[in-house]
Amino acid sequence: MSLDPTPPRSDDGRLLWSRSEELTGFEALMWRVEADPRMRSTVVIVETLDLEPDWDRFVAATEWASRVVPRFRERIVTPFLGAGTPHWALDPDFDLHYHLRRLRLPEGAGTPGLFTLAEQIAMTPLDPSRPLWEATLVGGLPDGGAALVFKLSHVLSDGMGLAQLLAGLHSRSREPMTDKPQPPPPSGPPATLSHEVVRQVRSDLGLVGGAARSLLGVASSLVRPDRAVRDAVAYVVSARRVLSPPPAPPLPALAHRSPSWRFRTLDVPFAELRAAGKSVGGSVNDAYVAGLLGAFRRYSERRGEPLPPDRLMPVTLPVSIRREEHEPGGNHFAPARLSAPVGIADPAARVVDVRRRMKIALGEPALESVEIVSAWLARLPGAVVAGFGGGATKSNDLQASNIPGLRDDAFLAGAKIVRSYPFAPLPGCAAMIAMVTHGDTCCVAANLDAASFTDLAGFEQDLADGFAEVLALGRSRG
């Protein structure tokens, strides 16, 4: 999957990316559910580099990025007296020195040591009083290589938005660009009580206005009351499906949960994955999900839980609901809930069944109802919201995401980006697995709950085997 165009720039050279002062309802909900430490929305992107960048050049590049993308200098402000919704505001005490770190792996640690370090960085909470990101340059990888471990909050953006961001920030040349725009540091008035009151009133009016527009839509449909009733009933039934966990029971082998994360990766040739899906009338995403299900079936069976062919498992797949009017960045996705065919051993039949079920999930009339509900839930106390959010996600065995990536060579402070692994947060599920296409390689990044997966080496092999059997479809039928 290729990336959308690079975000446009303003006249002064800033990226037009995630500029709204307001959090969406879903973003506010993600922020509030962090009252439960197990619901933290930390994202870690690990980019491996062919060489170690010059530190001063890396610092200068990051300082430039903080001027081009003002969100890097903004923090989330909790409303006065705790009433109302949180919002973005410039951090008057922004300190780049705090956000940048430099580490070197011990001799012989290699790539496994890098991902162990990334796990520890991911499990360390971001400081909520500062802008929600940190960047760690890691040296000491084999053959003179290095890595960037970029940690940020999911509240900043979804996967598509982050892909747009990196497309706008990464260079296409190893040499320094002397003609890139140099906007001044962002500035703005300090937050005051009067500004806060006006902002909250505007936010509340927007929420009420949205509800009113929905009611007007219903009223106008009464010109055809028979159709209106059918559509209303269909929407309510659809919303119940969208907002409820999939009806499939979780796998017993993955029953336990903890706040501990473990990272595993897999590289898959993009052309082969696409050919595998196409060979049975499916897409890259269908083949990707089928490969994951094959891994879960193998893992469950090795743990003493053989699965019958009709066994299903609960899976959620975030799908983009971005529209043309949406500015790049931010969170614009909805959860497609799937009772996924984990018991099907034949990879071809599994891909076909995944495609059938995905079409049904994506065709839900109320797919975007999560955003409507989130806007109201975000007004509740954090502890209440955390309980609701955890209950809605902990029954999932797997959340899986497929993110577009950069197809051309990209560079960071003179170092070529070799691979990019997006480790998304674990919101109560056993596994969150994301895939980004970098060049001609699909980089699969698995964030696994350490209590759910007690045999990590075994699952790593299961993941490789699950994709291998799917990739074989493209070779045997090509």
What are these regions (language model features)?
Residues 2-27, 35-37, 42-429, 433-464, ...:
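Soluble acyl-CoA-dependent acyltransferase catalytic core bearing the H(X)4D motif
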